[in-house]
Amino acid sequence: MQEASSAAAAGAEPGRRAAQHQFAGVDLRRPKGYAAPAPAPAVGEGDPCPRCASRDTKFCYYNNYNTSQPRHFCKGCRRYWTKGGTLRNVPVGGGTRKKPSSSSSSSSYVAAADADRQPKKKPASKKRRVVAPAPELATAADPGKTATTTTTTSEITTETGALEDSDSLAHLLLQPGTEDAEAVALGLGLSDFPSAGKAVLDDEDSFVWPAASFDMGACWAGAGFADPDPACIFLNLP
């Protein structure tokens, strides 16, 4: 016994202790009471596909974390299957199940969409002739309104005539050398006063200033002031 241990120690690396084979038949990596795992399949040999019987399959995962329902994928027909489950002909990336009625409804929907896309033709616009209504008969005029309008018009005419007469009179008076016949024709009676028209248009320089010997004191005396000098009025206040 000692010889075997010494031989093992001699064959071992220096500085390492010899391994003890006390639990030679026990796998310490697996807890006690669990069955040993199934041996891994050889490389290139997977579970046969239930559809195409191909061995080119691979394990994906356990369904619902249940080791009794492993899920596999077949690379030949690109289908999944689960052990103990039902087979479905649904390819990878495939859509949902279609009902026969859905195809007809989809075709009708496409036809309706195409109809909406087509431009709608505008109906031809009909030209309509618009006939003007016949003019209604004028209503009878109100006699009160007619009388008021006539009176107002006559008053305006009278005032306009009076203004024109006054303008013509001023024209005759301001024109020098107007013949007396025109005044007689208008009935103004200016022929008796031949100098009436000339008196208005006398020369502006014809005004005669009072003489230098004119006594201003007489005027101020009549007004109640005795001093003939107007400058002293404000100096001799009572």
Swiss-Prot record:
Any one Gene Ontology BP term: regulation of DNA-templated transcription
GO molecular function: DNA binding; DNA-binding transcription factor activity; transcription cis-regulatory region binding; zinc ion binding
InterPro entries: Dof (IPR045174), Znf_Dof (IPR003851)
Bias (Low complexity): 1-13, 138-155
Region (Disordered): 1-48, 85-155
Keyword Cytoplasm: no
GO annotations of cellular component type: nucleus
PROSITE patterns: ZF_DOF_1, ZF_DOF_2
Localization, UniProt: Nucleus
Entry keyword set: DNA-binding, Metal-binding, Nucleus, Transcription, Transcription regulation, Zinc, Zinc-finger
Chain residues that bind Zn(2+): 49, 52, 74, 77
Functional note: Transcription factor that binds specifically to a 5'-AA[AG]G-3' consensus core sequence at the MNF1-binding site.
Protein name: Dof zinc finger protein MNB1A
Chain's gene name: MNB1A
